[in-house]
Design a protein with these regions (language model features):
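Terminal amphipathic alpha-helical/low-complexity segments used for targeting or macromolecular assembly
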Residues: 1-58, 64, 82, 94, ...
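Structural signal for interior beta-strand "rungs" in well-ordered beta-sheet cores
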Residues: 48-49, 53-62, 66-193
Length: 260
């Protein structure tokens, strides 16, 4: 396959110490609205170590985006902005990686998925379907985000977790292990409190009737607001060496409950 781009004489050393070259289109790429002669982003070479083209004939890398190591952009995918794609990653299908996002490791972003903002996708994670990953979201490990799922703010998805359907996650939610969130789920950590040695997160969730409910996460425990006092009492029993009395601990529990 003939390359649709060439390396120009413009070069730089990036923050990882890799020499990069700005690219220029050698023919029109209608799928990406690119004209012959247009300047693009930065790559470390025209081909990967496997001998395959780093950028497929209908794909494009634009603006200040960087593609290096054994990363590639195939099919009709696009990488732009100040995005950085490295490792053994693949951006394929009609996927788009933009903003200041990073895709690394052996991650795969494909179909019509979008990764932008300051998002990070790494490890063996997969982002596919029409999923949108924004802001400071992190997807790593063996996690998979698919369907029309949307992740915002500082959500972190790891382990072998799977997010799909029209799920909407925001705030500081952490989804890991073998967790699965699907359909029209709404999950938001809207406040994180510190209660001595235990982190307490207030979580807002969508109820079947369309209204919003609330839950609380204390460590690995998640339960209804009505159980907060009992659960924090168990925390106090577990941490009796903490420099606080039972009454002080329970007073804090009631304060947290009142804020839910």
């Amino acid at each position: 396959m003939c390359a649709t781009f060439e390396l120009t004489g413009e070069r730089k050393i990036n923050k990882q110490g890799v020499r990069l070259y700005r690219i220029r289109a050698t023919r029109d790429i209608a799928a990406r609205g690119v004209r012959a002669g247009d300047l693009g982003g930065w790559v470390s070479s025209t081909h990967m170590t496997t001998g395959e083209l780093r950028i497929a004939k209908d794909a494009w890398v634009s603006h200040e985006a960087e593609i290096f190591e054994d990363a590639c952009v195939t099919d009709s995918a696009r990488v732009g902005g100040h995005a950085r794609v490295c490792g053994h990653t693949m951006i394929s299908g009609y996927a788009r990686v933009d903003g200041w996002s990073r895709v690394y490791g052996r991650a795969h972003v494909f179909e019509t998925a979008v990764v932008d903002g300051n998002a990070r996708v790494g490890g063996n994670a997969r982002v596919l379907g029409a999923a949108h990953i924004h802001d400071h979201v992190q997807v790593r490990g063996e996690a998979c985000v698919a369907g029309e799922a949307s992740l915002y703010d500082r959500v972190c998805v790891g382990g072998q977790a799977r997010i799909s359907g029209s799920a909407y996650l925001c705030g500081r939610a952490v989804i890991a292990g073998n967790a699965a969130i699907a359909e029209d789920a709404y999950f938001q950590v809207f406040e994180t409190l510190e209660t001595f040695e235990d982190s307490v997160e207030l979580i807002r969730t969508a109820l079947p009737n369309g209204e919003y409910g609330a839950q609380v996460r204390i460590g690995t425990w998640i339960g209804d607001i009505g159980s907060v006092v009992d659960q924090l009492f168990l925390c106090w029993q577990r941490h009796q060496h903490a420099r606080c009395s039972q009454s002080e601990w329970m007073e804090r529990a009631l304060q947290i409950r009142s804020r839910c």
